[in-house]
Amino acid sequence: MKLGLSKALLIFFWIVGLSFFSCKKSNELHPVKLVGQAFGTEFHITYYDTDQRDLTKQVDSLFYLINKSLSTYLPTSDISKINKGDTSIFVDAYFKEVFQKSEKVYNETNGIFDPTIDVLVNAWGFGPQNPLVRPDSLKIKELLTLVGFDKVQLTNGKIIKTNNSIYLGFNAIAKGYAVDVVARFLESKNIMNYLVEIGGEIRARGNNQTRKSPWKMGIEEPNFDGTRSLKKIIELKDEAIATSGNYRKFKIDSISGKKYAHILNTKTGYPSQNSLLSVSVIAKLDCADVDAYATALMAMPLEEAKFFLDKHQELKGFLIYSNNDGNVETFATSNF
C-alpha cells in the first residue's frame, strides 16, 4: 500500500509539474513581425503574443476596407465616388471618424489643416507621378473657391457639399488613422505590447519585450540629398508620433530650378514658404490626430507653430528649421 501511495504521489507531482511548465510556456510572449505594402508605402508591425498568431490576413483585410472607404487613388472607393458627384453614398464608420477628426483639427487650426486643399494639390501636380505644374494666379483664385472644409457637411450618413466640384482628400490623416485601426485590432486580440508603423506614422503600446525597455524610434535629419540619418532618438510610452517634412516630398521647377514643397498654404493656394524643415508631434492620442497636427504645424510660420504647441499642452513637439543664416536648428517643447 505504501509503495502504491508513493507511486501515486509521484505521478501526481509529475502531472502538476507538467501543468506548471506548460502554463509557464503558454504565458511567454513571443515577437511577431509583419512587413508589407499599403497606401503607397511600407508598413512594419511588431507585436508580442503568447500564441505567436500571424494576423497578416486580418490586417490586410483592414487595409482593404480603409482603402475602399478613403482612398482617392481607388476609383471605386466611397470618397472617389463622392468626389465625382455621387450623392447616394452612405459613408461607413471609417469615413465618419476621419471626417470628424479632420473637422476638429480644421477648426483648431483656423483652416490651416483642410482636406479640401487637394483640388489645388492636384493642380500643382503633386500627385505621385505627375510633373510639377505652375497654375496661373487666375486658376489658383478660381480653385480657392472650392477650398474650405466648412463647405462640406456630414448629415445623416451622407456627405453634403455646397459645390459639387469640391474635392475631398484625407491623405494627410489616413495613414495615421490606418495605424489606429490596426492598433485597436491588436488590442481586441489582447495584444498589449506592439508598435505599428505605416509610412513613418507610429503608435506604440507597452514595451519592447525583447529589450525589456520602452519602444524607441528615431527622428530623421532633414537631408535633401536623399540620404538618411537620425537627428534624435526618442522613447514612446503608450503614445503616437507623426512627422511631416518638406525635405523628401518636393518638386523642382525644370526652368527656374526652384524647389516647391508639397504642403500648400490653404489661404493662398501656393506652396507654403516658411523656415520649417520637419515637424514631429507626439501625444497620448490617436495617431490620426498627431498626423493631422503635424501636417498643420508644417504649414505654419515657425513662431505660429511654437505658439500653437504652447496652447496645446497635450502635444509634444520637435521642430527642425533653418535659421536666418541657413543653418539647421531645433526646437523642442518643454514637455518633450
Where are these regions (language model features)?
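Mature catalytic core of soluble alpha/beta enzymes
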Residues: K2-A8, F20-F336
